[in-house]
Amino acid sequence: MGYRKLGRTSDQRKAMLRDLATSLIVSERIETTEARAKEVRSVVEKLITLGKKGDLASRRNAAKTLRNVEILNEDDSTQTALQKLFGEIAERYSERQGGYTRILKVGPRRGDGAESVIIELV
């Protein structure tokens, strides 16, 4: 299966996709370019599938990709992006077989005219 190079070396591309995937798990909605959104969609779909499995091996595989970001909840407790993935998000999509993300076109970006989109969890 092919992939987009996104004008970066493989290390830079991997780091960017990790950052975007973590941001999408934490915020559940991000704005980025269309090419980046299509690439990060693949990463996030696989992460959510791992979250639904819920076993130790899946947790370790997801931890390889997600950044160790702390999230402050409404009740002043904190959780990591990994905990949110395996708790809240895995529960929400337990009955859904794929298709966890949605891409909405926003229009061209002001600075360079790149096609902007919003990618969000369904």
Curated annotation (Swiss-Prot):
UniProt keyword terms in alphabetical order: Ribonucleoprotein, Ribosomal protein
Domain of life of the native organism: Bacteria
Complex and partners: Part of the 50S ribosomal subunit. Contacts protein L32.
CC per GO annotation: cytosolic large ribosomal subunit
PANTHER family, alphabetized: LARGE RIBOSOMAL SUBUNIT PROTEIN BL17M (PTHR14413:SF16), RIBOSOMAL PROTEIN L17 (PTHR14413)
InterPro entries: Ribosomal_bL17, Ribosomal_bL17_CS, Ribosomal_bL17_sf
Gene encoding the protein: rplQ
Keyword Transmembrane: no
A GO biological process held by the record: translation
Protein name, per record: Large ribosomal subunit protein bL17
Family, per entry: Belongs to the bacterial ribosomal protein bL17 family.
Organism lineage string: Bacteria, Bacillati, Bacillota, Bacilli, Bacillales
Molecular functions (GO terms): structural constituent of ribosome
